[in-house]
Swiss-Prot record:
GO terms for cellular component: cytosol. It is an enzyme of class 2 (transferase). Iminosuccinate binds at residues 47, 68, 139-141, 156, 226-228, 243. This is Quinolinate synthase. It comes from Salmonella typhimurium (strain LT2 / SGSC1412 / ATCC 700720). Pathway: Cofactor biosynthesis; NAD(+) biosynthesis; quinolinate from iminoaspartate: step 1/1.
Length: 347
């Protein structure tokens, strides 16, 4: 049974939208970034949710575009002494925890995540202390401090398999922070899961009414859904999965049209995988909204070309990720458990 804990609702201070660059400015910063990457012995590690021009640059410079799990793997294996992480702050922290000898730079340290912000360590630690009989499993979208409080870290790509494993051992689970992903995992496994009440501000906004209207316009389209979405959206899906799993589903499904319910940043790599198919954004906004779909993380959008160039050029406190040594030691154990478990699934 999944029991829901309801912390005080958080209000997130969204960042301002980056100032658009003209074509000449974009080219200037692209060339500058390429030069700085070579000078700093650096490589770009970009998430699927960053803007297309950022993902393209990562490709052109031998970097990585992936989900959170593969980002974690890539950074540990690459020979570069500096990682430029284009994503949100927890991704940079994870890179530093796993590769402490490397310099970890980000375009901005102000790139937050609503799941991270919605799971403050003091409240979460008290929640865990109130349920000492439960194994603590936290999503990768959390701070280093929350990871250090956990027994396991997990990404959406292996969440179901891990909870199945723990359930087979008779363990009861605390799951944090995403309530929708926690509910999905519980329903898939039947495990005893006690959920924290966090949510992703992007996926939480997908609406069944608007999606039903879109399905009527495109009746032959398949619906691909990330499990951070509400249960009502997941129940409508033809395929449910992590970012990497949705790209695989796009390739295997026979449908020529695909409605995609996740951050629209994924369209860059998904369209590469299925150039012959039409990709449609799942609607998030209600009547009167100014966008057809608002499905793009405002913090991911902070990873612009100018900010990346500044991060590589300036470094320092405004761009370099630091993790307290004690926190790093505490967070490393559950992260390594995740990587070891993921390796057994691939074996």
């Amino acid at each position: 049974m999944s029991v829901m804990f309801d912390p005080q609702a958080a209000i997130y201070p969204f960042p301002p939208k980056p100032t658009p660059l003209n074509d000449d400015e974009k080219q200037f910063y692209r060339e500058k970034i390429k030069r700085l990457l070579k000078e700093r012995n650096a490589v770009m590690v970009a998430h699927y949710y960053t803007d297309p021009e950022i993902q393209q640059l990562a490709e052109e410079t031998g970097g990585c575009i992936s989900d959170s799990l593969e980002m974690a793997r890539f950074g540990t294996k690459h020979a570069a002494s500096t990682l430029l992480v284009a994503g949100v702050r927890f991704m940079g922290e994870t890179a530093k925890i796993l590769s402490p000898e490397k310099t970890i730079l980000m375009p901005t340290l102000a790139a937050e995540c609503s799941l991270d912000l919605g799971c403050p360590i003091d409240e979460f630690s008290a929640f865990c202390d109130a349920h000492p009989d439960r194994t603590v499993v936290v999503y990768a979208n959390t701070s280093a401090a929350v990871k250090a409080r956990a027994d396991w870290v997990v990404t959406s790509s292996i969440a179901v398999e891990l909870i199945e494993h723990l359930d087979s051992l008779g363990e009861k689970i605390i799951w944090a922070p995403d309530r929708h992903l926690g509910n999905y995992v519980q329903k898939q496994t039947g495990a005893d899961v006690l959920c924290w009440q966090g949510a992703c501000i992007v996926h939480d906004e997908f609406k069944t009414q608007a999606l039903t209207r879109l399905k009527k316009i495109y009746p032959d389209a398949a619906l691909l859904v990330h499990p951070e979405s509400p249960q009502s959206i997941v129940e409508m899906a033809d395929a449910v999965g992590s970012t990497s799993q949705l790209i695989k589903a796009a390739k295997t499904l026979p449908h020529r049209q695909l409605i995609v319910a996740t951050d629209r940043g994924i369209f860059y790599k998904m369209q590469q995988a299925v150039p012959e198919k039409e990709l449609l954004e799942a609607p998030t906004a209600g009547e009167g909204a100014t966008c057809r779909s608002c499905a793009h993380c405002p913090w991911m959008a902070m990873n612009g070309l100018k900010a990346i160039a500044e991060g590589l050029e300036q470094g320092g406190a405004a761009h370099e990720i630091q993790v307290d040594a004690a926190l790093r030691e505490g967070a490393l154990l559950p992260l390594n458990r995740m990587l070891d478990f993921a390796a057994t699934l691939r074996a």
